[in-house]
Amino acid sequence: MHRNLAVSYLICLAPLLASLTVVMPNSVVAQQELPAAEKIDFNRARELFQKRQKGEKLTDDEDAYLRKAIAARRGSDGPAPAAPAPREKTGLIPLSDMTADDRYQGEDGGLYGAGRNAPPATHENAARVELSQIRPLNAAGEPAETGRVVFISISMSNATQEFSRFKQLADADSAKSDLLTIVDCAQGGQAMAEWAPADARPWTVAEQTLARAGVTSRQVQVAWIKLANKGPRGTLKEHGRKLEQDTTAVIQNAKSRFPNLRIAYLSSRIYGGYAVNALNPEPYAYESAFVARWLIQNQVKGDAALNYSAEKGPIKAPLLLWGPYLWADGTSPRKSDQLIYTRGDLAGDGTHPSDAGRTKVARLMVDFFKTDPLSKTWFTRQALPNR
């Protein structure tokens, strides 16, 4: 195959092969109908695809196996749904503007539910306890006057585009603590499903990124996680439960990889109504906020899978809070702050932020972390305990 054609072939197949992980419910269902000898090991297929991406030559048998996996994956998933026509607004109400009486597919309003945009008192008190433990740590994770408080991002391309600009603005802001090191660990193409396996490559890349920044995994105490999966389908209950499952795994992995992680701030996507593809259009971008809320509500209710307190059993997760809520209904101003997204805030695909959009989101993030009553305790200039 001509080199250019081969490259084009891989580029076209990248989204498909990126989904070839061990956890593949649709493919598992499809394989149940195949004879045992014809079942596909999608983990092996993914390894072969990554081998080819590195420029290594596949044997004839390996190449045939990879093509067979691609065909099986296509057959189990079917064609991706088309994106709706781009539009300036949808008529959907931002979750932070919804009241306790408003309903969307049975869900009421408020970031924390019941029309509330602040955490319940018990959860806020628990958050303050966790926040009181944030202090400068050395490379071994021990308190030290010369240590660092590390704040990372975990998610996909939109997140790294936004968080990298946030880092630029925050590092230049005189309000930011000198003890805080911000590291962008989010990675293009790596949505929640890609981070969900405990041994997934994004975790290795994240640790390499930390090393390049001169810090370690034991110094990470705060994370920002942006919720999204690629090509969601179906109703909120259908695609939302998959995103909930994947993000729960991501949160657990983060706590395991970063043992001193105290707080994880969750955010949903920006407006997706200008999308020209099915990567994450509306209403999926809007609906990801409900999944973030489900996770926090699960933790508030005592879900053992998201337990953060040693008093309640094995610790599985950091404490969860809302980070900045980034969605607004296109050109329809959000009540709380008049936030809008114009077509110019999005790149050509209508899904990723443009340079102006990156800056808009980054400013929202800086404003949130330095003014929120809970986050400003570690984000802004003030004496953090060294004990």
Can you describe what each PLM-predicted range is?
Residues S8-V23:
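Bacterial N-terminal signal peptides
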Residues M24-A30:
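Sec/Tat signal peptide C-region and signal peptidase I cleavage site
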Residues Q31-G78:
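Alpha-helical, heptad-rich or low-complexity scaffold/stalk segments
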Residues Q50-K57, R67-G75, K167-D171, A175, ...:
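Sec-exported extracytoplasmic/periplasmic mature domains
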Residues P81-I152, K370, L374-R387:
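N-terminal module-boundary/linker segments of secreted carbohydrate-active enzymes
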Residues R103-R128, P143-E244:
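Conserved SGNH/GDSL esterase-like catalytic core that processes O-acyl groups on lipids
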Residues V183-N280, A289, L295, Q299-V300, ...:
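Active-site cradle of extracellular carbohydrate-active enzymes
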Residues I270-R387:
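Catalytic His-Asp segment of secreted/periplasmic serine-dependent ester chemistry enzymes
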